Amino acid sequence: MGNGLWFVGVIILGAAWGQVHDWTEQTDPWFLDGLGMDRMYWRDTNTGRLWLPNTPDPQKPPRGFLAPPDELNLTTASLPLLRWYEERFCFVLVTTAEFPRDPGQLLYIPKTYLLGRPPNASLPAPTTVEPTAQPPPAVAPLKGLLHNPTASVLLRSRAWVTFSAVPDPEALTFPRGDNVATASHPSGPRDTPPPRPPVGARRHPTTELDITHLHNASTTWLATRGLLRSPGRYVYFSPSASTWPVGIWTTGELVLGCDAALVRARYGREFMGLVISMHDSPPAEVMVVPAGQTLDRVGDPADENPPGALPGPPGGPRYRVFVLGSLTRADNGSALDALRRVGGYPEEGTNYAQFLSRAYAEFFSGDAGAEQGPRPPLFWRLTGLLATSGFAFVNAAHANGAVCLSDLLGFLAHSRALAGLAARGAAGCAADSVFFNVSVLDPTARLQLEARLQHLVAEILEREQSLALHALGYQLAFVLDSPSAYDAVAPSAAHLIDALYAEFLGGRVVTTPVVHRALFYASAVLRQPFLAGVPSAVQRERARRSLLIASALCTSDVAAATNADLRTALARADHQKTLFWLPDHFSPCAASLRFDLDESVFILDALAQATRSETPVEVLAQQTHGLASTLTRWAHYNALIRAFVPEASHRCGGQSANVEPRILVPITHNASYVVTHSPLPRGIGYKLTGVDVRRPLFLTYLTATCEGSTRDIESKRLVRTQNQRDLGLVGAVFMRYTPAGEVMSVLLVDTDNTQQQIAAGPTEGAPSVFSSDVPSTALLLFPNGTVIHLLAFDTQPVAAIAPGFLAASALGVVMITAALAGILKVLRTSVPFFWRRE
């Protein structure tokens, strides 16, 4: 290719990377395999013509910009002479896997363009001085094509011909945010640095971890060396091909994907490359480099002005952030604002926990429940915070040389939980298509850590009785994300949910943070098998029971209290000293089969329990509705219903009823009750009486059969039984609903003590979850499809008379009595003959 081309390649790579390469140079394997294929280079053996490449026609832009220069006068006759070199150009042959049948394209690229100079600029003079060896930089753009390991990928892109990854750079060039780093606050004004190991603190090997270390996880330090991936040489290639490849020292990767979205974050020393793509929005890319580094755009070589730097906010004291995307100022303003916010996250702190706390709060933001379907702006913000938390975690761990056990387990658990929420709640992913992986640990160390954690999980379940430790055991299984870990803790998790339900029926409080946390991870453990394929019969039965009990725990009062608790916690969290951890505020409603929590009656109940504040009523109502919608959206996994409640999604005649379930009650292993606002064409249907005609309720008993029928609900004061030992009510469900169409509760009758309460009827003055002061109707749903109206548990409306009205009425009676007495006295005086005796 000529000495000039070699000279340009040396200059470009020498300036960018010194004498240190972050890749291994390899010979093209096709060339080695094709040494014996020289006869195929003949284009036409009859006439003896040699193989010749195609060249672009200079008269047909835009590809004509890469045509051979006129001074070479390359023609069909002169091409075989191989006089292709021209001092001011680099020539490149681009072909496909069909080569040599596909002769390829011979392209010419101006050297001035590769050097980032104007087209008419003069080339630098050759130098005989060898470049000085320097320590490899953390980030170095690899300009040029010679020895570039991704040159073929770059050349196959359309970036130089017809495509621009950033059509509107001005839209993505924006001022720095209010909370980003400044000279006086190089880590951000709201940054709370992560804890550092005390001087002389011991670094524990993962193979020696025991339950004592779990008890003291916040003071147990693990050495970074050997635990996290050591920085390794890596070439990062922008998927949009909008900038030159970048040589970095990689430290790991975070990947989140599903059937509707893909997020990939590549971490390096002082570097992050984040790509967010969705089916419903154009892709976006964020690149973080050291403050003094610049990444140039790859553009059309025919442009009069050389491409400038990538767009983004101005550089800060530590980093410079570049933002790439096809959004323009004419596009959706909320999407552009979300991308700008994502571009500011890397400079807003160094503590991974702050970003995870903000991501949880973002999930419950005002627009979280505003609409159905994918919401790209919310997904970008959530995944931007999630990726930045990993960036902060890895950087802090390498900087401190150690990481505490609580931070390691917390980051792995919360990032996995948030990944699921972002995928299902913002991207619209099918629940069984979500995958997530954080590869920041050394592969060997990861295997050792997983083996040790698996052993600790078994030890916790065998020896410990503490609810907090059992919750930690379920969390460890959630972190391990392996079938063996889930199977090991599933029996304990199912027993815990049963125990919490017994406490709830007994009227005891089950709303402490440790209870919420235990319920969060126990529910996740029992629901997880459906992601790995078809669940076994035992797994399906456990999951169905956990879903039924979660629905029973989610009464209307609990739903309203959950809404109030979340609002209070979100208002209190400053994401600095007070963080918002969603598992500590987890509600059984989010793990239930209740999909009616965003209906108006529940919103009014939640508003009625709201404490007095200065928040305007309209804002409070919007927040309440957003939280309720998010809870409903969080719980509604269609794939989960198909896996664990298949009778509810069974198709008859190739079609399923287009009716949205409001509540599902899996009452046996193969039958469920479903509450809807419209009748279903199959199953045993009941129309609930005494309900507002504008919000009717229908109750249907479903199995896998397609027959349909209707029945009337039989009314009884109490359930009469012949056998006092076994009343036959265990397994039934007690359901209460109001005239407004609100289902207040669906309570499982799971023990003998519970069925005795139902048989005895309500006791006046004795509080019970089966009683209510609200006018309502009580039903008993049996596993065989029979439904009974329990008259004794009905609450009838009582006429409420105001005290003022009673006082006025009493005064009126007195006045009327006095008036009558006066009239009688007048009559006796005026008509004396009425009183004479004959």
From Swiss-Prot:
Its main location: virion. Keywords: Fusion of virus membrane with host cell membrane, Fusion of virus membrane with host membrane, Glycoprotein, Host cell membrane, Host endosome, Host membrane, Membrane, Sialic acid, Signal, Transmembrane, Transmembrane helix, Viral envelope protein, Viral penetration into host cytoplasm, Virion, Virus entry into host cell. Residues 1-18 form the signal peptide. N-glycosylated, O-glycosylated, and sialylated. One of its GO terms (biological process) is symbiont entry into host cell. This is Envelope glycoprotein H. Residues 19-803 are virion surface. The heterodimer glycoprotein H-glycoprotein L is required for the fusion of viral and plasma membranes leading to virus entry into the host cell. Following initial binding to host receptor, membrane fusion is mediated by the fusion machinery composed of gB and the heterodimer gH/gL. May also be involved in the fusion between the virion envelope and the outer nuclear membrane during virion morphogenesis. Residues 825-838 are intravirion. Belongs to the herpesviridae glycoprotein H family. Glycans are attached at N73, N120, N216, N332, N437, N670, N784. One of its GO terms (cellular component) is viral envelope. Residues 174-204 are annotated as: Disordered. The chain crosses the membrane at residues 804-824. Interacts with glycoprotein L (gL); this interaction is necessary for the correct processing and cell surface expression of gH. The heterodimer gH/gL seems to interact with gB trimers during fusion. Residues 259-323 are annotated as: Interaction with gL. It is found in: Virion membrane; Host cell membrane; Host endosome membrane. It is a single-pass type I membrane protein.
